């Protein structure tokens, strides 16, 4: 044996892997290895001592013990060790050998490259007939059979990467599932698979013939992805899943809408004929066909599952966090704490998956408690191109899925032309997600039959590839040939399937000519919500109720060690409420939340540091000073109250805002808020604002009551901590699509938050929220301003009792600058200062009436802190001047504020103070 050890290089050959794995096993559970190995490993101080000459004798002794146990095994103990090493190395590296490319363009590695030849493990061809027994194997093989089994399992049409999975139970389960080979298909199932392929390809070809050149972003070449999604849904249904939400980009979407989600073919075809996707009377912009979502119920026997496909823009992968948020909201509604009743399927393209940062943001947040949805089943449709860019131009790794390993996700790569392999991989992935509640990826390597779209010419840039594609059999044809060869179908079966489906589509086409598009919205939970406001929402709450709630919010458990500074703060709040004294911003916000919670409204607030608040004002989560326990006063108001969920988010804007927007889509009765650490950082999520929040209603008939809190205000903190880019939100504002506000009083924020739930419409609310004003002595409101029969006031008149006829100058402003103007004005009674608490929609009637009140004034000024090319000026100029005309005043508003600037603010506090003083003096006419 010792001689054999020297021959095979035991210590430094394939057995090294085996010994290292055995050592890991020993570290986890010493009793799980033989006593002799226990003695050896107990003498090892670190893994570097495992494989050196001084330990050889001890290893040989342990090996001899193993040999005595398996003396009847025809293969020596040394080789038995090497069998383990070979199996492990196949598991780790054989995916590089797998035949994944249906076009045959990829040059794969060889066994010699990967050191997977039998010679690398001390075997020779003479031993191929020798019988092998090993703990990894469920049955006995000879060496040749074992090699064939490993080749078929790990180097065939499926290549797997499971080694990054950190949990050993999960990893072993995955390998066992793959190696068991139990997933097979009956003749009837094979026929159903073929039928699916016929319908996928048939619909694409039908559209291609009827509407030549029309964009549809065909799935052809990646046909298996549609069949795989259907398989995943059917498997999930039998696992007790009640709902599946699907997110995807545009490629293959029309087939997903029809074949997977169940939208009638005639509805999709009608969109090609008329160009209309919604009823004309809705008067909305709509969107292209391959961006639209849909929902339906699929019934199989006595089981039913609800399916929904999320709407999305052309911004690839942007939908990822939105659909995840929607899934989480649905799980929360069902109290699905195990995350097993509502499931997520996400379809990616290869270039976008590794190219778009939101993918990494979404993946990294998926295991976190506030964003976990029990795992996502990811399908990466790798058609080996990104528009015209080759794979080598879009990533440095072989696989587009490489960086997904940051969350230790198992990955199965599969050849898209081998439909049964695709379905086997899907089966494993679906089971894994449901069993372990974690993400899993199936990458389908396929191709794109046409160019990026059907009007694009791919031969310009990928001539070699497309010459292969042109002469290639489709996945349906390939599978039909296999079934004919195996005797499952005869030569006519495939042709009949195609004829039957073509006849069905012809009927659908005729019905599509007179098809009236339907608007599937404002049903179910959304009943009672309307697109237009019918009345002003009364948002006030009885004063005694507010005092009672406020007092309750200031009470702490006796055994809970609150920070002494917070004890003082809460005592002061309680005293103010009890004495009916004015309250500050944080108190008003907490009262808004408390009054909604006790009325049955669930509230969810996330964002960086939002539990405490960036500016240490909210303190809605109290931390015990002795241990790590927490106490949330808002969840301790009454036994019947709704839930307040608050979570400090990971350091992301794009994905976190997207998640909360998605959460808000599921239930209009929830108040959902996202707070930026500083408003300046919100533009990291600009795509969410542009493509979803501002435009989803007119594009897709999707409403949202999401609240976005953006700390804003020029306070000398530099260009990155001053501006939430108010001007950008005002530029996006149109068609009554959202509220853009810059409130200045606690009463305003109280009413704004409550209006989001009490009103009969759901519009996103953008709030330029305060920073220094959170502790400003004048930023307070009386409880009466929050009391019964009160409401949000979009415009606030001059607070002092000035004689209107004596007013010579009227200053309109919004936000923090008001308090600076107010203080500098002092006792000057000839200047009236009016605040716009809501900039959009512009409350023209209210402004006109106030201007009429001050019609004796000779000067009308719009004052802002922001540079002239920022802030509200360029949006509001025409509104203000039109209001002057309606008020019968022949004048125009003059701008006073900072000059135009490429940067939002100066970097110096001294320079800021000079600028601020200058604009205030100019506005007030102070020398």
From Swiss-Prot:
GO biological process: glycolytic process; tricarboxylic acid cycle
Keyword Oxidoreductase: yes
SUPFAM superfamilies per record: Thiamin diphosphate-binding fold (THDP-binding)
Pfam family, one: OxoGdeHyase_C
Aminoacyl-tRNA synthetase as UniProt keyword: no
Record keywords: Glycolysis, Oxidoreductase, Thiamine pyrophosphate
Enzyme Commission code: 1.2.4.2
Disulphide bond pairs: none
Catalytic reaction equation(s): N(6)-[(R)-lipoyl]-L-lysyl-[protein] + 2-oxoglutarate + H(+) = N(6)-[(R)-S(8)-succinyldihydrolipoyl]-L-lysyl-[protein] + CO2
Broad class of enzyme this protein falls into: oxidoreductase
GO cellular component: cytosol; oxoglutarate dehydrogenase complex
An MF annotation (GO) of this entry: thiamine pyrophosphate binding
CC cofactor: thiamine diphosphate
Family to which this protein belongs: Belongs to the alpha-ketoglutarate dehydrogenase family.
Role noted for this protein: E1 component of the 2-oxoglutarate dehydrogenase (OGDH) complex which catalyzes the decarboxylation of 2-oxoglutarate, the first step in the conversion of 2-oxoglutarate to succinyl-CoA and CO(2).
Assembly information from the UniProt record: Homodimer. Part of the 2-oxoglutarate dehydrogenase (OGDH) complex composed of E1 (2-oxoglutarate dehydrogenase), E2 (dihydrolipoamide succinyltransferase) and E3 (dihydrolipoamide dehydrogenase); the complex contains multiple copies of the three enzymatic components (E1, E2 and E3).
NCBIfam families for the chain: 2oxo_dh_E1 (TIGR00239), PRK09404.1 (NF006914), PRK12270.1 (NF008907)
PANTHER family registered for this protein in UniProt: 2-OXOADIPATE DEHYDROGENASE COMPLEX COMPONENT E1 (PTHR23152:SF4), 2-OXOGLUTARATE DEHYDROGENASE (PTHR23152)
Name of this protein: 2-oxoglutarate dehydrogenase E1 component
Species, as recorded: Rickettsia bellii (strain RML369-C)
Gene transcribed to yield this protein: sucA
């Amino acid at each position: 044996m010792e001689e054999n050890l020297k021959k095979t290089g035991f210590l430094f050959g394939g057995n090294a892997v085996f010994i290292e794995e055995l050592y890991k096993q020993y570290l986890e559970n010493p009793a799980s290895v033989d006593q002799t190995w226990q003695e050896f490993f107990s003498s090892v101080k670190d893994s570097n001592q495992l494989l050196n000459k001084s330990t050889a004798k001890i290893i040989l002794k342990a090996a001899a013990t193993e040999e005595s146990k398996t003396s009847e095994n025809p293969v020596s103990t040394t080789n038995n060790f090497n069998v383990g090493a070979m199996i492990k190395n196949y598991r780790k590296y054989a995916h590089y050998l797998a035949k994944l490319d249906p076009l045959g363009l990829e040059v794969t590695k060889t066994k010699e490259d990967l050191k997977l030849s039998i010679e690398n493990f001390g075997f020779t061809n003479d031993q191929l007939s020798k019988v092998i027994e090993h703990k990894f194997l469920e049955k006995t093989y000879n060496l040749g059979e074992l090699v064939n089994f490993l080749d078929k399992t790990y180097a065939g049409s499926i290549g797997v990467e499971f080694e990054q999975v950190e949990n050993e139970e999960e990893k072993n389960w995955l390998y066992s599932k793959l190696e068991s080979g139990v997933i097979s298909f009956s003749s009837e199932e094979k026929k159903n698979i073929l039928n699916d392929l016929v319908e996928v390809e048939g619909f694409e070809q039908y559209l291609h013939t009827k509407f030549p050149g029309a964009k549809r972003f065909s799935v052809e070449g990646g046909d298996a992805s549609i069949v795989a999604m259907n398989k995943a849904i059917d498997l999930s249904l039998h696992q007790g899943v009640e709902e599946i939400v699907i997110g995807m980009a545009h490629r293959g979407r029309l087939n997903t809408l029809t074949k997977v989600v169940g939208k009638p073919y005639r509805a999709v075809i009608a969109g090609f004929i008329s160009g209309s996707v919604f009823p004309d009377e809705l008067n909305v912009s709509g969107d292209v066909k391959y961006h639209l979502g849909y929902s339906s119920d699929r019934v199989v026997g006595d089981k039913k599952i609800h399916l929904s496909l999320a709407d999305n823009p052309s911004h690839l992968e942007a939908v990822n966090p939105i659909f995840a948020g929607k899934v989480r909201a649905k799980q929360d509604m069902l109290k699905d704490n195990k995350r097993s009743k509502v499931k997520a399927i996400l379809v990616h393209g290869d270039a976008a998956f590794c190219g778009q940062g939101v993918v990494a943001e979404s993946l990294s947040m998926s295991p976190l408690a506030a964003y976990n949805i029990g795992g996502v089943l990811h399908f990466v449709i790798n058609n080996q191109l990104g528009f015209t860019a080759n794979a080598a131009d879009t990533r440095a790794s072989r696989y587009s899925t490489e960086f997904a390993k940051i969350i230790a996700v198992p990955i199965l790569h599969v050849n898209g032309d081998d439909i049964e392999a695709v379905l086997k991989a899907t089966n494993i992935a679906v089971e894994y997600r449901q069993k372990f509640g974690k993400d899993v990826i199936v990458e389908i390597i396929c191709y794109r039959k046409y160019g990026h779209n059907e009007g694009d010419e791919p031969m310009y840039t990928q001539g070699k590839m497309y010459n292969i594609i042109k002469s290639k059999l489709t996945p349906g044809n390939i599978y039909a040939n296999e079934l004919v060869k195996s005797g499952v179908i005869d030569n006519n079966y495939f042709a009949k399937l195609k004829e039957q489906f073509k006849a069905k589509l012809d009927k659908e086409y005729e019905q599509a000519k007179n098809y009236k598009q339907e608007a599937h919205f404002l049903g179910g939970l959304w009943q009672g919500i309307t697109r237009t406001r019918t009345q002003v929402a009364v948002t006030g709450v009885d004063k005694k109720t507010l005092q009672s709630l406020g007092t309750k919010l200031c009470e702490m458990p006796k055994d809970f060690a609150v920070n002494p500074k917070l004890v003082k703060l809460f005592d002061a709040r309680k005293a103010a409420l009890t004495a009916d004294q004015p309250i500050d911003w944080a108190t008003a916000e907490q009262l808004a939340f408390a009054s909604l919670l006790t009325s049955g409204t669930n509230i969810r607030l996330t964002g960086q540091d939002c539990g405490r608040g960036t500016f240490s004002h909210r303190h809605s989560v109290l931390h015990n000073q002795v241990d790590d326990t927490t106490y949330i006063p808002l969840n301790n108001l009454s036994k019947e109250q709704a839930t307040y969920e608050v979570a400090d988010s990971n350091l992301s804007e794009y994905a976190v805002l997207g998640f909360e927007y998605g959460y808000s889509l599921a239930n209009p009765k929830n108040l959902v808020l996202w707070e930026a650490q500083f408003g300046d950082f919100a533009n990291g999520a600009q795509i969410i604002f542009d493509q979803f929040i501002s435009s989803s209603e007119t594009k897709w008939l999707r409403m949202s009551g999401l609240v976005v809190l953006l700390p804003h205000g020029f306070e000398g903190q530099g260009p990155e901590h001053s501006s939430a880019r108010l001007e950008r939100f005002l530029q996006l504002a149109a068609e009554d699509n959202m509220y853009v506000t810059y409130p200045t009083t606690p009463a305003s924020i109280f009413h704004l938050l409550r209006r989001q739930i009490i009103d009969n419409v759901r519009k996103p609310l953008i709030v330029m929220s305060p920073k220094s004003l959170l502790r400003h002595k004048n930023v307070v409101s009386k409880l009466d301003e929050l009391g019964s029969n009160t409401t949000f006031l979009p415009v606030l008149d001059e607070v002092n009792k000035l004689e209107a006829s004596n007013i010579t100058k009227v200053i309109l402003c919004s936000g923090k600058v008001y308090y600076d103007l107010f203080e500098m004005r002092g006792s000057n009674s000839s200047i009236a200062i009016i605040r716009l608490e809501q900039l959009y929609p512009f409350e023209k009637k209210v402004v006109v009436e106030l201007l009429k009140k001050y019609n004796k004034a000779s000067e009308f000024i719009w004052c802002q802190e922001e540079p002239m090319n920022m802030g509200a000026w360029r949006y509001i100029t025409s509104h203000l001047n039109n209001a002057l005309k309606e008020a019968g005043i022949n004048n125009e508003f003059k701008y006073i504020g900072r000059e135009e600037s490429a940067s939002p603010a100066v970097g110096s506090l001294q320079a800021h103070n000079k600028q601020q003083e200058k604009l205030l003096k100019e506005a007030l006419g102070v020398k």
